Curated annotation (Swiss-Prot):
Name of the protein in its database record: Histone H1t
SUPFAM superfamilies: Winged helix' DNA-binding domain
Organism the protein comes from: Rattus norvegicus (Rat)
Compartments where found: Nucleus; Chromosome
Entry keyword Membrane: no
Length: 208
């Protein structure tokens, strides 16, 4: 009996099942920029608009809305916010309601709020002036830092030295002229002596 080798059992290895790639939800480009920027706070815009008005009786709600719209605030969408802000500001004492009731009527700044706005404007203007002065000084400083070559003035002869020189020259001229005068006087005196002698001789001859 020939022994037959057992046939190698063919073992089938199951292929690895690939899991479907799960897509991660990433932020879409432009999502961060798509968010609307925060609008201006109405509680700050209303006092600023009222401070610009020069009406003693206050500003009406319609005029206030026009001023807010001119400042870039969306009045139509935020109508309810404007009314709530007006009520809050009146309760806090920032605004005074001169006409009407509730959110309708006319409003103006209280004396305390008006004085605070004036002080803030004064501080801002003073700081702006200080900055301008600092810039102007800084711009002028490089020019002044340049060393200027100072030319030495020529020594001008003083009047005293000139007068001294003139007096010295005059004295020298007088000294030079004086010998000639002395000679002239000597010659004149000699001539006069000769004349006197001649006259004496003539007188003596006449007497003889």
């Amino acid at each position: 009996m020939s022994e037959t080798a057992p046939a190698a059992s063919s073992t089938l290895v199951p292929a690895p099942v690939e899991k479907p790639a799960t897509k991660r939800r990433g932020k879409k480009p432009g999502m961060a920029t798509a968010r609307k920027p925060r609008g201006f706070s109405v509680s700050k815009l209303i006092p600023e608009a009222l401070s610009m008005s020069q009406e003693r009786a206050g500003m009406s709600l319609a005029a206030l809305k026009k001023a807010l719209a001119a400042a870039g605030y969306d009045v139509e969408k935020n109508n309810s916010r404007i009314k709530l802000a007006l009520k809050r500001l009146v309760n806090k004492g920032v605004l005074v309601q001169t006409k009407g009731t509730g959110a309708s009527g006319s409003f103006k700044l209280s004396k305390k709020a008006a004085s605070g706005n004036d002080k803030g404007k004064g501080k801002k203007s003073a700081s702006a002036k200080a900055k301008k002065l600092g810039l102007s000084r800084a711009s002028r400083s490089p020019k002044s830092s340049k060393t200027k070559v100072v030319k030495k003035p020529k020594a001008t002869p003083t009047k005293g030295s000139g007068s001294r020189r003139k007096t010295k020259g005059a004295k020298g001229l007088q000294q030079r002229k004086s010998p000639a005068k002395a000679r002239a006087t000597n010659s004149n005196s000699g001539k006069s002596k000769m004349v006197m002698q001649k006259t004496d001789l003539r007188k003596a001859a006449g007497r003889k």
